[in-house]
Amino acid sequence: MIRTHDAGSLRATDAGSTVTLAGWVARRRDHGGVIFVDLRDGSGVAQVVLREEDAHVLRNEYCVRVTGEVTRRPEGNENPELATGEVEVTAEELEVLSEAAPLPLPVDDQIEAGDDVRLRYRYLDLRRSGPASALRLRSAANQIARTVLHERDFLEIETPTLTRSTPEGARDFLVPVRLQPGTWYALPQSPQLFKQLLMVGGMERYYQIARCYRDEDFRADRQPEFTQLDIEMSFVTEDDVIDLGEAIVSRLWRELAGHQITRPIPRITWHEAMARYGSDKPDLRYGVELTELTDYLRGTRFRVFAGAIEAGGYVGAVVMPGGAAQSRKELDGWQDWAKARGAKGLAYVVLDAETGEARGPVAKNLSTEHLAGLADVVGAKPGDAIFFAAGAESRAAQELLGAARVEIARRANLVDESAWAFCWVVDAPMFERVTDREEAGAGGWTAVHHPFTAPNAEWMDRFEEAPDRALAYAYDIVCNGNEIGGGSIRIHRGDVQQRVFDLLGITPEQARDKFGFLLEAFKYGPPPHGGIAFGWDRVCMLLAGADSIREVIAFPKTRGGFDPLTAAPTPITAAQRLEAGVDARPKPEARAQAGTAGPAAPVADPT
């Protein structure tokens, strides 16, 4: 054994004992013939006292082994900021296990470094307490989730990561098959179809911490490879899945964030979330709700609002508390903010702090009658600003106001950063119209989630009558404006599945090609089933108090999908390309077999 104790485990009760420690030189301080070294390992830091002649070669991040006696620090020299701050180790033996070159990245929590440097030297970055504690928290989260699920008799089952390409919204990462030139595997975007097959197979309660891959345009805080806590259950209702989701989340937040979540977690419908917050993942740590003004402003002569109302669209508003104090430049800046989001602008009025009189471009275009009651309708006070959005499409206008709501909360310091606010968003739309014929298929509609999501009871028998209003047994859990998990009850009846395919314009041939193996399995008594998947990177990010999912991933990539550590992705050689069969054309028989399950194999006679 190289060491007898962890550096961070030493306490005053260990005084008088001889220990052997191993770790890195975190800091060195010379004091006239004596050198003090902060020795760091994965458990923490211990102070080691060495003779100068023994330790003069030591530099930061040398890896060393020290044997010595634990003694109490002299009175007045204790360090209350360290768990080991009452003691030190007087070294009797020192062994340099390996030396360290000059550091490209300071291994110091007090010194910030750029993301590119941190990712390029991630192994050094992980020696810092912040990044290291984030990964330890993630490991603890994994263990807690497994404990909750095993308490409920779930099975941890691995599903393939080399599979066939199926449509799930984003592009697949494709892998050429050397032994079958011209054919390709796909890395899974989720274990969705396999976990449903496990339900057909009678596994009933499945989970895995699954690696998933999506070749999508990089935006916001995304990674091309990510992790889900993936769950599926047989013979369950929506309430059963939600109850399990709450059990997992409440245990995680209690043990890792010290926060007791009040259960049941509130539920709001998707349409209510859009109407009140302009988002299907609302941040409930603050108020500032949207107000629809379509009926209130009916009859207005202001062309922007009148045009939207006449088109059967939407006019709404959101209030910025104290917003009237903004300068003209700041108010004009909101127009640039809106245009950056694809809108034409963001109309506004400000209410005089003394008189409450409405001023601004919109005020000049509204009637005295409409202006008189406006503040009461939207809940504004003197000194506030009111922002408006209008459009023939309600959702786009609501989403613009929803984004404004978030920006208002940020600028007006309305967010309690120490608070946790959870909700479920339920009864999501089942379909949405798509104008891209290639994406939508012959039906002109696409599934909001996936084509195996079940309609809710109200729409089960009539979703074809009004696809734009049909609701699904789909549910998302939201924390502080972040969607951290989502799922649905699945279709298990063949007649309902066929009706969905018909609406989506998916022909029997296309269905067999895309989902043949699943449809074949569904001929043999599939149980009612449903599930949920948690975005594990985002869950851990929130628990760690981090600003990006990169902080809780061991070796993350940049926003452009580049890995500064390994310089991946890289070109392949001509020889590799030829051997992998990248340019080969598939044989006709391989194309004919794709996606078909074929006839069922004969069942052996048990006698």
UniProtKB/Swiss-Prot annotation:
Its EC number is 6.1.1.23. One of its GO terms (biological process) is aspartyl-tRNA aminoacylation. It is an enzyme of class 6 (ligase). One of its GO terms (cellular component) is cytoplasm. It comes from the Bacteria. Residues 591-607 have a biased composition (Low complexity). Residues 578-607 are annotated as: Disordered. One of its GO terms (molecular function) is aspartate-tRNA(Asn) ligase activity. NCBIfam families: aspS_bact, PRK00476.1. HAMAP family: Asp_tRNA_synth_type1. Homodimer. This is Aspartate--tRNA(Asp/Asn) ligase. The gene is aspS.
